[in-house]
């Protein structure tokens, strides 16, 4: 039973009537462009075929009822006419409540909803299960009540909910790719303008995601420290964001900066340049150049931004040794664990799977999880 069938069946069973709509929003993997989004820079993610699915129907009153199928059918119920506050014990509820609260501030021309939520985006892996949930919930209200909101606005609404209601200082990329993803393409996103350019993926290339299963937490962690260091760097150059600083300007005065801040700034500036070049390499089908750029990105995250861990570096080394220059591999996501992403010819997938299975656990004591993904369509009805 797929997620659509599962949520529709559960909806009918619990609520006693059929759902009118089923909405999906995908998770994502970022191919290159890490920690550039909140610096107004460029990112190159693609949506993946793992998603949050919500079967839903409008109500004729002002109540929102939510069932979380993946949490033993836990229930949340709240009124649109009372102030929406955080839930004491159900963290998943706060993503739903936050999205609805911020939607009310944008356009409150909507009423109650019944919904059943389920998803298969791996949680805590850096594949944006939370953004997928936020975009799915926003799309539910937009579709059921014909709200005049486009994908970018639904994405921004989700980001606001996560920043202000949930309390995690994320950038815009995760929500934007979930809302705007295009099948068989990556998106080069300008995080300042929110402009997105579809970049076709070469034929016969697999997007492989390997979860290190080294546990990471983002909320309240090193992520916010990195963000502050980047803001310190932008202030030093008297610019609104690091996006506005050139590598030449940085190199001329790097020695005047705090050494740690200088490393963080160098990563962001070089990563922005790599990301723009990667989009054109991908479009030309130049997997060799893409691989070089991904390798440089990983080294920069490891040495300048200092967000990798030994388990992740081990995974990258195993994959790189297997594929050589036929594709690329790097850490993806916020850092401190999580996943690596590899772009490799489909016929090399079995060899990579085997090499990782034979070596990773032996070296780290942790068993990996291996996903082969397809670049997928963004949020909408399914």
From Swiss-Prot:
Catalytic site: 174 (proton acceptor)
Binding sites annotated in the UniProt record for ATP: 124-130
Biological process, per Gene Ontology: galactose metabolic process
Class of the enzyme per the UniProt entry, highest EC level: transferase
Localization per Swiss-Prot or TrEMBL: Cytoplasm
Sites where the protein binds substrate: 34-37, 223
A cellular-component GO term for this protein: cytosol
Annotated positions for site Transition state stabilizer: 28
Pathway noted in the entry: Carbohydrate metabolism; galactose metabolism
Gene3D superfamilies according to UniProt: 3.30.230.10, GHMP kinase, C-terminal domain (3.30.70.890)
A GO molecular-function annotation: galactokinase activity
Keywords: ATP-binding, Carbohydrate metabolism, Cytoplasm, Galactose metabolism, Kinase, Magnesium, Metal-binding, Nucleotide-binding, Transferase
EC annotation from Swiss-Prot or TrEMBL: 2.7.1.6
Reactions performed catalytically: alpha-D-galactose + ATP = alpha-D-galactose 1-phosphate + ADP + H(+)
Family matches, as PROSITE patterns: GALACTOKINASE, GHMP_KINASES_ATP
Family: Belongs to the GHMP kinase family. GalK subfamily.
Function: Catalyzes the transfer of the gamma-phosphate of ATP to D-galactose to form alpha-D-galactose-1-phosphate (Gal-1-P).
PANTHER family found in the cross-reference section: GALACTOKINASE-RELATED, MEVALONATE KINASE/GALACTOKINASE
Protein name: Galactokinase
Organism name: Salmonella heidelberg (strain SL476)
Gene name in the database record: galK
């Amino acid at each position: 039973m797929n997620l659509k069938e599962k949520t529709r069946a559960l909806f009918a069973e619990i609520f006693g009537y059929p759902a009118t709509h089923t909405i999906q929003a995908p998770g994502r993997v970022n191919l290159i462009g890490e920690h550039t989004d909140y610096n107004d820079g460029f990112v190159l993610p693609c949506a993946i075929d793992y998603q949050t699915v919500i079967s839903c129907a409008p109500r004729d009153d002002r109540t929102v009822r939510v069932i979380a199928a993946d949490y033993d059918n836990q229930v949340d119920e709240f009124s649109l006419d009372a102030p929406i506050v955080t839930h004491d014990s159900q963290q998943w509820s706060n993503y739903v409540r936050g999205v609805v609260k911020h939607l009310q501030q944008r356009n409150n021309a909507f009423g109650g909803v019944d919904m059943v939520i389920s998803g298969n985006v791996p949680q805590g892996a850096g594949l944006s299960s939370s953004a997928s949930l936020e975009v799915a919930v926003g799309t539910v209200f937009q579709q059921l009540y014909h709200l005049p909101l486009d994908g970018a606005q639904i994405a921004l609404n989700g980001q606001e909910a996560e920043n202000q209601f949930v309390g995690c200082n994320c950038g815009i990329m995760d929500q934007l790719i979930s809302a705007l993803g295009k099948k068989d393409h990556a998106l080069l996103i300008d995080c300042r303008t929110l402009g997105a350019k579809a970049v076709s993926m070469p034929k016969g290339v697999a997007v492989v995601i390997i979860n290190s299963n080294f546990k990471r937490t983002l909320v309240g962690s090193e992520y916010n420290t990195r963000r502050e260091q980047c803001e310190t760097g932008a202030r030093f150059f008297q610019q609104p964001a690091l996006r506005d600083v050139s590598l030449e300007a940085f190199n001329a005065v790097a020695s005047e900066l705090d050494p740690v801040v200088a490393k963080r700034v160098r990563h962001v500036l070089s990563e922005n340049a790599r990301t723009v070049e990667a989009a054109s390499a991908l479009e030309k089908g130049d997997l060799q150049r893409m691989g070089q750029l991904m390798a440089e990105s990983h080294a920069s995250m490891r040495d300048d931004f200092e967000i990798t861990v030994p388990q992740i570096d081990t995974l990258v080394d195993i994959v790189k040794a297997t594929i050589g220059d036929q594709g690329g591999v790097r850490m993806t996501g916020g850092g401190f664990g999580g996943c690596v992403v590899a772009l490799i010819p489909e016929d090399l997938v079995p060899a990579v799977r085997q090499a990782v299975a034979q070596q990773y656990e032996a070296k780290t004591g942790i068993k990996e999880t291996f996903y082969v993904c397809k670049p997928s369509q963004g949020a909408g009805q399914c």
